[in-house]
Design a protein with these regions (language model features):
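Amphipathic alpha-helical coiled-coil segments
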Residues: 4-85, 92-103
Length: 106
């Protein structure tokens, strides 16, 4: 009947709207994650640069007799932590890119 057809069409439109909302939500989340991870990589690179500088300075100061081995070891630990954070940031960024490509079907 005509009434059933209208009801069926209404249900179809609601389902389509629901699917569109879900897709938009997934896309928005993927874009947000991508932006966040790009920022994390930038920050991690800056921290890595500072850790390199700090380690160079601590090593130089130690060789000049101005710093202790503890200072060098502390700088090495900071460098290792910065390096680990950079690797994790790159990994998170790659995962965010993969999720974005999945959502956009690239």
């Amino acid at each position: 009947t005509n009434r059933q057809q209208k009801a069926y069409i209404g249900i179809q439109k609601l389902q389509q709207s629901y699917m569109t909302d879900n897709i938009n939500e997934e896309l928005s989340a993927a874009l947000t994650k991508l932006t966040e991870t790009e920022s994390q990589v930038k920050t991690a690179k800056e921290n890595m640069s500072l850790a390199n500088e700090n380690l160079d300075l601590a090593t130089f100061s130690y060789n000049e007799g101005k710093a202790s081995m503890v200072d060098v070891l502390s700088a090495q630990l900071s460098w290792t932590q910065a390096h680990t954070n950079l690797i994790n940031a790159y990994l998170a960024e790659k995962m965010a890119v993969a999720e974005y490509k999945k959502v956009t079907s690239e």
